[in-house]
C-alpha cells in the first residue's frame, strides 16, 4: 500500500499565504486614499487626529503583514520538513 502526500500543495499553500500578505500593501494604500478623501472628519488631512489614524493604520497593517508572512514561511517549512522526513523514512525501507 502506497500513501502519496502532496507536499507541493503544502508549499503552494504557504506561498499563497505569503503572496496575500504582500498584496496587503495595495489595500493599505487604497484605505489611506479613502481616509484622505474623508479627512474633514478628522479635521483635515494635516490634523493630528488624521495623521494619528493613518499612523496607527500603518502599524496595524504591518503587524498583519508580518504575521501572515511568518505563517506562510512556517507552512512552507513544515511541508519541506515532512517531505524530507518522508523521503528519509521511505529510503530506509527500500
Swiss-Prot record:
InterPro entries listed in its UniProt record: ESAT-6-like_Myco, ESAT-6-like_sf, T7SS_ESAT-6-like
Keywords assigned: Secreted
Q: What is this protein called?
A: ESAT-6-like protein EsxI
Q: Name one GO cellular component term.
A: extracellular region
Gene3D superfamilies given for it? ESAT-6-like
Gene name of this polypeptide: esxI
Question: Where is the major localization of this protein?
Answer: secreted
Similarity field: Belongs to the WXG100 family. ESAT-6 subfamily.
List locations, semicolon-separated: Secreted
- Return the Pfam families for the record: WXG100
Amino acid at each position: 500500500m502506497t500513501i502519496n502526500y502532496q507536499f507541493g500543495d503544502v508549499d503552494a499553500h504557504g506561498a499563497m499565504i505569503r503572496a496575500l500578505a504582500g498584496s496587503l500593501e495595495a489595500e493599505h494604500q487604497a484605505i489611506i486614499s479613502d481616509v484622505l478623501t474623508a479627512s474633514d472628519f478628522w479635521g483635515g488631512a494635516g490634523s493630528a487626529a488624521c495623521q494619528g489614524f493613518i499612523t496607527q493604520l500603518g502599524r496595524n497593517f504591518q503587524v498583519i503583514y508580518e504575521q501572515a508572512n511568518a505563517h506562510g514561511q512556517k507552512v512552507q517549512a513544515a511541508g519541506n520538513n515532512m517531505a524530507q522526513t518522508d523521503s528519509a523514512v521511505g529510503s530506509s525501507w527500500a
